[in-house]
Amino acid sequence: MIIHPNFDPVAIHLGPLAVRWYGLMYLVGFIAAIVVGRIRLKLPYVAAQGWTAKDIDDMMFYGVLGTVLGGRLGYVLFYKADFYFSHPLDVFKVWEGGMSFHGGFLGVTLAMMLFAWQRKRHWLQVTDFVAPMVPTGLAAGRLGNFINGELWGRVTDPTAPWAMLFPGAMRDDAAWLPKHPALVEKWHLADVFMQYQMLPRHPSQLYEIALEGIALFFVLFLFARKPRPMGAISALFLIGYGLARFTVEFAREPDDFLGLLALGLSMGQWLSLPMIVAGVAMMVWAYRRRAANANAAA
């Protein structure tokens, strides 16, 4: 078994100021997105659409606002609505954590629609340009989760080569044992807990880096190298992220205040299903629209 390094959550100490890893990873993610965007400017069809480096910089401003505001509101509404409705001022305590990708996604989508309206572009043209830039940011964010030792995976077989012990999960591990006697006996987890005071878990943050970050980036980047029907790149992002997140959630520990919901699925899975359906519908619409336009022009 591998023991999580239990990194110091503060990356840089500057006198009384502390730069935390999670915030630093957000910065790295946005910088990586800018780099990917500038690489895309070199594609002939992208240049023909009139995109510029200034457009990317402006989109990042909108993207940051959409990510932070949407991510926070999404967490409040999707995950802990009852608590925050009872403690409304706690909504503003972002330093205590609590961000939702799906909320951030909606926030960024609205921000890009506003950007498109201001630049007099179709909003799908904007999201098609932005979509390949997003996975690098997702990977950076999940790396921040891993460094912080948070959002760990479900308990797994201690003999598995990927099994990892997370010091931050000690309390959850102790509470897990009496609820799963069959697995405790099958995997001899009582002995493991006696020795380490922790249980082996999936490092699901690394799975998310691999699927939602690296794999999704290459799929989108390669797909977007050639001109596609308007909306197709955005659709592929919806499908790709939805499938990746839905899959990884089987190895990720559900939020303790929600647990598993209907059909044994987590909140993350239920929020990903509409993304997949919308992505498939948008992909079909995009290619049918291009075919209809081609027939009309013939």
Swiss-Prot record:
GO terms for cellular component: plasma membrane. It is found in: Cell inner membrane. It is a multi-pass membrane protein. GO terms for molecular function: phosphatidylglycerol-prolipoprotein diacylglyceryl transferase activity. Its EC number is 2.5.1.145. Keywords: Cell inner membrane, Cell membrane, Membrane, Transferase, Transmembrane, Transmembrane helix. Its main location: membrane. Pathway: Protein modification; lipoprotein biosynthesis (diacylglyceryl transfer). A 1,2-diacyl-sn-glycero-3-phospho-(1'-sn-glycerol) binds at R142. Signal peptide: none annotated. The chain crosses the membrane at residues 17-37, 59-79, 97-117, 230-250, 257-277. It is an enzyme of class 2 (transferase). Coiled coil: none annotated. GO terms for biological process: lipoprotein biosynthetic process. PROSITE patterns: LGT. InterPro entries: Lgt. NCBIfam families: lgt. Belongs to the Lgt family. Catalyzes the transfer of the diacylglyceryl group from phosphatidylglycerol to the sulfhydryl group of the N-terminal cysteine of a prolipoprotein, the first step in the formation of mature lipoproteins. This is Phosphatidylglycerol--prolipoprotein diacylglyceryl transferase. It comes from Burkholderia cenocepacia (strain ATCC BAA-245 / DSM 16553 / LMG 16656 / NCTC 13227 / J2315 / CF5610) (Burkholderia cepacia (strain J2315)). The lineage of its organism: Bacteria, Pseudomonadati, Pseudomonadota, Betaproteobacteria, Burkholderiales.
